Amino acid sequence: MEGQQHGEQLKRGLKNRHIQLIALGGAIGTGLFLGSASVIQSAGPGIILGYAIAGFIAFLIMRQLGEMVVEEPVAGSFSHFAYKYWGSFAGFASGWNYWVLYVLVAMAELTAVGKYIQFWYPEIPTWVSAAVFFVVINAINLTNVKVFGEMEFWFAIIKVIAVVAMIIFGAWLLFSGNGGPQASVSNLWDQGGFLPHGFTGLVMMMAIIMFSFGGLELVGITAAEADNPEQSIPKATNQVIYRILIFYIGSLAVLLSLMPWTRVTADTSPFVLIFHELGDTFVANALNIVVLTAALSVYNSCVYCNSRMLFGLAQQGNAPKALASVDKRGVPVNTILVSALVTALCVLINYLAPESAFGLLMALVVSALVINWAMISLAHMKFRRAKQEQGVVTRFPALLYPLGNWICLLFMAAVLVIMLMTPGMAISVYLIPVWLIVLGIGYLFKEKTAKAVKAH
């Protein structure tokens, strides 16, 4: 598989270290750096428990996807499994849903990049920075998969070092007495208890917490280009979860011990507050580099992910055939360009449209992710049933099957209910049936076209 091939094969150019950090980088993004502030305000120190619960659900989903991917490492990942074990509409819907999800995320991250650049150069409009990084990252992804893996590896390294530095520095402030009189582990329970707003405060935040873990399923997408999927996928799946729990739970435990949670404001990153102790300008610049890297890293993953998903859809016959080709370096150029074109349109819409349109798009991301994870779990149940009937013993079985699947599905349902009760998020839940109808129409059109072609 390692040779230069032309036609319809992706090149296996990703090593285990790339796959580990692609998943880790996908999960350490804006959610941890900025999103945790509003959760802390609502849930207090209980956010730590929230991340543990969401981390467990994410791990179950990753293991379900991991089991399928180790057996059949193909491009298109779970849309392939939904297609093969559940039915052609399920494959069509899950693939396109995932593609749209990451186009929306890509657009959001590019906008964030523009805002971060303004920290240094306020006179540069956001759309200019977004356009520059849009061109650079897409150009890099057009070279070959190894370059993508290498770039994502270093992006993720920067984020990981920043979080580790924060944990070490925070722990030093805490235990050396240099953190001031307010720094004490008792902050975790002194200010109105571990769950100051009761369990309700935590439950209402589970939707936002869950989306910090979105991106973990990137491990499944990398399978077709992994050097040795039978070994690297189980390893990446099992190790990533420990690391994420250390990064999320570790950093938040240190953060919330350093000062009372009541001092966290929704419009500032909690990380800015803690690094503030180092002295203003150095910290502000260092942190801005980190959040900029985080946004670029997630956008980089989006470009990779979208092109591979579209490639998989084309191979299944769910997208135009021209998208199922790769160049002599094994890069799916057409799918990268098509995904880029749509993302560029989003940047334009984002530039022209008021903030409300952008808020709505982000709420759609939330719903698309729920559909995505639920479909992984459902496709896995069908996959396991089929394998049991064939008498096949899988090499990397998921945890707690089938109970684990039902736990995940109940969790997704609960998240949707929570979103219905959350102002600004409810609209995206109402749009789920509309989106499914659009997918249904697209599927019928595809079937009709395929029949017409056969008739000729």
From Swiss-Prot:
Transmembrane segments: 19-39, 42-62, 86-106, 117-137, 155-175, 201-221, 240-260, 271-291, 333-353, 358-378, 399-419, 425-445
Side Periplasmic, residues: 40-41, 107-116, 176-200, 261-270, 354-357, 420-424
GO biological process terms on file: amino acid transport; transmembrane transport
Membrane topology, as annotated: Multi-pass membrane protein
InterPro entries: AA-permease/SLC12A_dom (IPR004841), Amino_acid_permease_CS (IPR004840)
Keyword Lyase included in the entry's annotation: no
Compartments where found: Cell inner membrane
Gene Ontology CC: one annotated term: plasma membrane
Topological domain ranges for the Cytoplasmic compartment: 1-18, 63-85, 138-154, 222-239, 292-332, 379-398, 446-456
Keywords (A to Z) from UniProt: Amino-acid transport, Cell inner membrane, Cell membrane, Membrane, Transmembrane, Transmembrane helix, Transport
UniProt family annotation: Belongs to the amino acid-polyamine-organocation (APC) superfamily. Amino acid transporter (AAT) (TC 2.A.3.1) family.
Functional note: Permease that is involved in the active transport across the cytoplasmic membrane of all three aromatic amino acids, phenylalanine, tyrosine and tryptophan.
NCBIfam families in the record: PRK10238.1
Protein name: Aromatic amino acid transport protein AroP
Native source species: Escherichia coli O6:H1 (strain CFT073 / ATCC 700928 / UPEC)
